[in-house]
Amino acid sequence: MEFDSIINGDFVASAERSQNINPSDLSDVVGLFARADRAVTNQAIEAAAEAFPSWSATTPQLRHDILKRASDLILQRVDTLGRALSREEGKTLAEGMGEATRAGQVFAFFAGECLRAGGEQLPSTRPGVGVTITREALGVVGLITPWNFPIAIPAWKIAPALAWGNTVVLKPAEIAPHSAWLLVQILAEAGLPKGVLNLVLGKGSVVGEALVEHPKVAAISFTGSVNTGRRIAQGCTAALPMKKVQLEMGGKNPLVVLDDADLDLAVEAALNGAFYSTGQRCTASSRLIVTKGIHDAFVARLSERMQALVVGHALDAKTQIGPVVDQNQFEIDLGYIARGTDEGARLIGGEVVKAETEGYFLRPALFTEADNAMAIAREEIFGPVACVIAVDDFESAMEVANDTDFGLSSGICTTSLKYAEAFKRRSGAGMAMVNLPTAGVDYHVPFGGRKGSSYGSREQGTYARDFYSAVKTAYTLA
């Protein structure tokens, strides 16, 4: 089946197409997806620009109703959307359905935000003068989304953009575009006017670059790699006029396990954070920093649990770990496994798994005897690969945890209130978890990090308004 870009409510074909392959079964082609060029991208931007004046002038009630209908439709189709997501990206079916549910919840939340826009009215320091502070839409917003959450991340960017009256050009990841395509179709069914949301399928180096350079695009929100994010930021500041930019770029997240931790709880937090979703989460626990008193018991228990995980076809109900997303990521993961061994760490697991279908199946890999200077502890792998770093005590654990170029998520397992509070205060990450996996954030709270992980305003929750709206201060002489 062929899938085209969607511009101004119409399907727009491209001369080139890319195959979307099921990573659980390489013989299963999900579809042939358009590979748009710069001209098609510019067409989408012009459609969004033309739709902006009328959409930004709509009432909060109208925007609420459309977003709420979209939420209802998504939640009614969780089974279908979850299965489509798992088929193209490789998440287990339970994870795929959970992500589709999250997308519906996000739209419901931002439907409510349409009615909570608010503002301020203040007296001036000058007599007889009033001050009104309001928020306004930016204009055309370019959204560039990754493959690892192919419906949730488009949802948490699209929903606030529309709630605040912006129009959108969405460019989903080329290797997992089907979920975004289905989401755009649902929004049209919910009554979103033509041109307000436009979907451009294609390569980031073509579509993304056109979005960054076009003068009618007011802002870019990007989730992806650090290197690409930096190029986008440079392009947005070099463009005329300059663009507002928001970047989410990954992590190398620590989970600290102290001697006083509940061992079973700590192991389950590490197992979930490091290996679920095949480790393909920017919030994954890729560095397990463990004090020496509990180290051996923790490693033994975690090794036992991880090697018992069922690796297989994403749509098989028995599967706990699905395939790696594609050949390129599969080779990256195997390369880091070889590199960790070469660096002197001891490998547990990490074998290629043969299944009934040909796919990118990899057993979770755990490195012990690692140190924080190794590449496997410094660089984001984005696969089911984690390392254990032994430390003496809480102070040395904090030093290692914060010794990273990233700062997205962090966690600690402890029964000590003293250490839990100290960790939350001293963690160099934007999110800190106590006795929980580092992966897993509610949809109504801010998401984002520090250092090389994030740049610009936070995503999600009420904090999303800071990116998707502009503040205006108006004075009136009475």
Label each PLM-derived region with a short phrase:
Residues 1-25:
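Hydrophobic face of amphipathic alpha-helices that form TPR/SEL1-like repeat modules
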Residues 9, 27, 63, 85, ...:
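Residue-level signal for inorganic ion chemistry
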Residues 27-118, 128:
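Glycine-rich loop-to-alpha-helix module at the N-terminal edge of alpha/beta enzyme cores
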Residues 28-31, 217, 310, 337, ...:
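Conserved C-terminal structural/oligomerization subdomain of aldehyde/semialdehyde dehydrogenase
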Residues 30-36, 51-57, 143, 255-258, ...:
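Short, well-ordered beta-strand elements within core beta-sheets of diverse protein domains
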Residues 119-265, 391:
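Rossmann-like NAD(P) dinucleotide-binding subdomain of oxidoreductase/dehydrogenase enzymes
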Residues 167-169, 347, 431:
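A short hydrophobic/small-residue beta-strand
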Residues 219, 227-371, 434:
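ALDH superfamily catalytic-core signature
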